[in-house]
């Protein structure tokens, strides 16, 4: 591929050549949110003789005096740098480039050195050489990398052509450059604190969340995936902790991990910081100067239909001075000048009451924002797996008498045997923590079990809800439980049932944010991002396969550590586990298994599917109208086919994989360091066969794309109306004879609302969910790449096109299922079609930006 025509080139007239090229980059712009003067200063620098230079590196001619590296050609400068004026928004600029290349001496170029002598960085996207001797067609270098001024680096910035090589196949002249680049990215000998121009990927534990919180990772009590290291100085009062930054300072992540478009990243960062530093104090003042509570559902709906006027507060005024001018109007309501007004969540757009129905409550277990929890019931009554020596007997108190009247004539045993009983079981998950959690101010949380019946028409219906609270008896944490069954609305008993569903939703909301979302997508992915960059060259086929699914993940995780999951952060403030939240997630991580994260394995583990070789995806759903699973299996299968076909190009047999030094180092470090607290678990794949690699890559892509999309982008559409997905419960279920019960009879909406998430928690929580549920206009969806020339391999390009085409076909199937009246779980009473796993591959223009409740981005970027 690379050497084609070389001999012909070296004989004949082409002993030297002038190679013409094109450079595409994005300059720092006069409207850049972070650096207003970048373009002006660069212009002055150019007149002083500064600029950008490039040097080609040979892939065929070796310089024995330079460690066997490929020979380096003469410098070439960008042409028309000054006259190519930037657009008003940060956009691409194109420049010419001409190389004097001695073909006879230097052979065929395969890499390029880029030097930046300007005073600010730029984003190098691609360099394309035309009519290169020794190659057919163009030679493209895909960079997508920020180039800082040369003085910031201890080494030259080298980029490789878009060819693909296993380590053993790399041209000898380029091998040292490949090894150098990986060594630079590992940066194991570099001391911090790291700056934004540093390109260092190292690991650290979660010791940066603030004082009074456990260190997550590196200890048996709180095992955890690793995060990216920043090398900030230790905390002054506790050296085992890393010091915190102020909210407007930037946490270090390697610059190429940050959002490609500056405005996108800054808008997200400023949005979250606006909520934390500006809107929160204003809302606190608002709450202090008003009754401080919502009293009816209409009060909450007014957030969307009318908004609330925020008072002037010093913190909000101060933030106005610190934020870039053009963001203030969008992000910061100031005094009476503007309202805090939120968009109407999808769940109440068509019908403001549908969320209260039992049908919608059950449907969201299959097609809501947390559709990954429901399991098939295999024994009755449900048993507990809690240690009886610590907790006693926690067997469920739900009896056959509670549920048999709603089983369509079946007995409990018949319903079990016919796969008609299902459970949302949060009992064991929360019971061990409830004594501590309920000692937090404003908390009273139950551990819940909810039983569902699969009706003959394919819909689920709730049968019973068990609410349990911990009781200390004889040195054991036993349970005091009560069972509630459905009651029609309109009576006080009906409102008791409504509250029982709300307590379940509180459990499910907490678990969703803490585990389904944060731990099982964001946190577990970061070690793969770090290890891939440390051990897989950009020329490696597996790097090319996985890198799109890492975009922006380290950035959003760093932002989360700074403002969301930190001590006293928004998560602790708005979701019930409070300061115990992250510690609880560490306990859950003890049982995390990478091999169970793929969708088919997860469905089988939960009893929602069985293996079936005759089914299209080799598994058969036991609830056929399970929108998350039905759409997800189609997506999983498409990813699986793509990965298998792609890897087959480069790994004809297992021996090639076993001899791949980079993949073996990558997998070893992922297991032993990135997920090092679980390194001795027996389930880790050995990475000795191509099917093992294919399954691992499919799982990584699934987690970063579809799984995250399923649990993230429905947050505001479903939970933006807090009564549907409350995050906190503040008091016990009202009992007859109490004032709370009398209030429930007298003013049921007020009693309901005063039991769940408070007004200030609601306003802050839904403001955040709105930000986190949006798609950016430059979103890259599954089946899309940021650069068409991501590889020079026509076989790989063809495999990827087939993948994209399959995803577009799935889009049509999803829309078709949503219009099928037989599939009642696709829309539900709220008339909100399930589109969270609609790929949106066909949208190449960013038309579906904002709160769309659809689309599978390539990566965890928000």
Curated annotation (Swiss-Prot):
Q: Which GO terms describe its molecular function?
A: linoleate 9S-lipoxygenase activity; metal ion binding
Q: Where is the PLAT domain?
A: 34-161
Region annotated Disordered, chain positions: 212-241
Q: Reaction catalysed?
A: (9Z,12Z)-octadecadienoate + O2 = (9S)-hydroperoxy-(10E,12Z)-octadecadienoate
Q: Where is the signal peptide?
A: none
CDD domains xref list: PLAT_LH2
Which biological processes are named by the entry's GO terms?
A: fatty acid biosynthetic process; lipid oxidation; oxylipin biosynthetic process
Q: Which InterPro entries match?
A: LipOase (IPR000907), LipOase_C (IPR013819), LipOase_C_sf (IPR036226), LipOase_CS (IPR020834), LipOase_Fe_BS (IPR020833), LipOase_plant (IPR001246), Lipoxy_PLAT/LH2 (IPR042057), Lipoxygenase_dom_3 (IPR027433)
Q: Which residues bind Fe cation per the record?
A: 517, 522, 708, 712, 862
Listed transmembrane segments: none
Print the miscellaneous field.
With linoleate as substrate, lipoxygenase 1 shows a specificity for carbon 9 as the site for hydroperoxidation (in contrast to lipoxygenase 2, which shows a preference for carbon 13).
Task: Give the PANTHER family listed for this entry.
Answer: LIPOXYGENASE
Q: Which family does it belong to?
A: Belongs to the lipoxygenase family.
Q: Give the protein's recorded name.
A: Linoleate 9S-lipoxygenase 1
> To which species is this protein native?
Hordeum vulgare
According to the entry, what is the taxonomic lineage of the organism? Eukaryota, Viridiplantae, Streptophyta, Embryophyta, Tracheophyta
Task: Name the gene that codes for it.
Answer: LOX1.1
């Amino acid at each position: 591929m690379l050497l084609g025509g070389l001999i012909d080139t070296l004989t004949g007239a082409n002993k030297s050549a002038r190679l013409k090229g094109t450079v595409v980059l994005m300059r720092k712009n006069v409207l850049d949110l972070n650096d207003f003067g970048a373009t002006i200063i660069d212009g002055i620098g150019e007149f002083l003789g500064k600029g950008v230079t490039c040097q080609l590196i040979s892939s065929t001619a070796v310089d024995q005096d330079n460690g066997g590296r490929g020979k380096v050609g003469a410098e070439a400068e960008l042409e028309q740098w000054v006259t190519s004026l930037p657009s008003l928004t940060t956009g691409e600029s194109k420049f010419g480039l001409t190389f004097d290349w001695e073909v006879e001496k230097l052979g065929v170029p395969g890499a390029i050195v880029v030097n930046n002598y300007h005073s600010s960085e730029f984003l190098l996207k691609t360099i394309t050489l035309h009519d290169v001797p020794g190659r057919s067609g163009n030679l493209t270098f895909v960079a997508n990398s920020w180039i800082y001024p040369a003085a910031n680096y201890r080494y030259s910035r080298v980029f490789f052509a878009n060819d693909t090589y296993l380590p053993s196949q790399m041209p000898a002249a380029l091998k040292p450059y490949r090894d150098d680049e990986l060594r630079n990215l590992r940066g194991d000998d570099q001391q911090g604190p790291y700056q934004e121009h540093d390109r260092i990927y190292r690991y650290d534990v979660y010791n940066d969340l603030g004082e009074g919180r456990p260190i997550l990772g590196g200890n048996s009590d709180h095992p955890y995936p690793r995060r990216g290291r920043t090398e900030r100085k230790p905390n002054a009062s506790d050296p085992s902790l890393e010091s915190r930054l102020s909210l407007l300072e930037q946490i270090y992540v390697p610059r190429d991990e940050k959002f490609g478009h500056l405005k996108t990243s800054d808008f997200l960062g400023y949005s979250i910081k606006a909520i934390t530093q500006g809107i929160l104090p204003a809302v606190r003042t608002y709450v202090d100067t008003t009754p401080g509570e919502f009293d009816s559902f209409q009060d909450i709906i007014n957030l969307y239909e009318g908004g609330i006027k925020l008072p002037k507060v010093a913190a909000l005024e101060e933030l106005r001075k610190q934020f870039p001018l053009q963001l203030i109007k969008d992000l910061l309501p100031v005094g009476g000048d503007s309202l805090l007004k939120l968009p109407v969540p999808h769940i109440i757009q068509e019908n403001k009451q549908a969320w209260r129905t039992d049908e919608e409550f059950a449907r969201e277990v299959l097609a809501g924002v947390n559709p990954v929890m429901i399991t098939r019931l295999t024994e009755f009554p449900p048993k507990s797996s809690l240690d009886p020596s610590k907790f006693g007997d926690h067997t469920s108190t739900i009896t056959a008498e509670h549920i048999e009247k709603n089983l369509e004539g079946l007995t409990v045993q018949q319903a079990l045997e016919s796969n008609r009983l299902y459970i949302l079981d949060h009992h064991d998950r929360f019971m061990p923590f409830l004594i501590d959690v309920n000692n937090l101010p404003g908390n009273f949380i139950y551990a819940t079990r909810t039983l569902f019946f699969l009706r003959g028409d394919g819909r689920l219906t709730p049968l019973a809800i068990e609410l349990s609270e911990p009781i200390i008896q004889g040195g054991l944490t036993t349970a005091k439980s009560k069972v509630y069954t459905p009651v029609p609305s309109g009576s006080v008993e009906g409102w008791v049932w409504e509250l029982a569903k709300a307590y379940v939703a509180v459990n499910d909301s907490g678990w969703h944010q803490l585990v389904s979302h944060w731990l099982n997508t964001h946190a577990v992915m970061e070690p793969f991002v770090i290890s891939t960059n440390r051990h897989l060259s950009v020329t490696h086929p597996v790097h090319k396969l996985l890198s799109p699914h890492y975009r922006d993940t380290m950035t959003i995780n760093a932002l989360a550590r700074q403002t969301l999951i930190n001590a006293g952060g928004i998560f602790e403030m708005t979701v019930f586990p409070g300061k115990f939240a992250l510690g609880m997630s560490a306990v859950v991580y003890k049982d995390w298994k990478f091999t169970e994260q793929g969708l088919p394995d997860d469905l089988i583990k939960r009893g929602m599917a069985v293996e079936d070789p005759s089914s299209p995806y080799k598994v058969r759903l036991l609830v056929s109208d399970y929108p998350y699973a039905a759409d997800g299996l189609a997506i999983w299968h498409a990813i699986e086919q793509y990965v298998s076909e792609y890897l087959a190009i480069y790994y004809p047999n297992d021996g090639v994989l076993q001899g791949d030094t980079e993949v073996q180092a990558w997998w070893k470090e992922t297991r032993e360091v990135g997920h090092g607290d679980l390194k001795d678990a027996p389930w880790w794949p050995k990475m000795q066969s191509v099917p093992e690699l294919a399954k691992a890559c499919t799982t990584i892509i699934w987690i970063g794309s579809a799984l995250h999309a399923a649990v993230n982008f429905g947050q505001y559409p479903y939970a933006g109306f807090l009564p549907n997905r409350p995050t906190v419960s503040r008091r016990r279920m009202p009992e007859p004879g109490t004032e709370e019960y009398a209030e429930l009879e007298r003013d049921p909406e007020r009693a309901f609302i005063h039991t769940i998430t408070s007004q200030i928690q609601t306003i802050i929580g839904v403001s955040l969910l709105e930000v986190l549920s949006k798609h950016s206009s430059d979103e890259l969806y599954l089946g899309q790449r940021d650069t068409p020339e991501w590889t020079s391999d026509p076989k790989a390009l063809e495999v990827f096109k087939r993948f994209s085409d399959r995803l577009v076909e799935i889009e049509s199937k999803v829309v078709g299922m949503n219009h099928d009246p037989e599939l009642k779980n696709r829309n539900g009473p709220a008339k909100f079609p399930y589109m969270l796993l609609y790929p949106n591959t066909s949208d190449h223009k960013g038309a579906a930006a904002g709160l769309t409740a659809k689309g599978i981005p390539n990566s965890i970027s928000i």
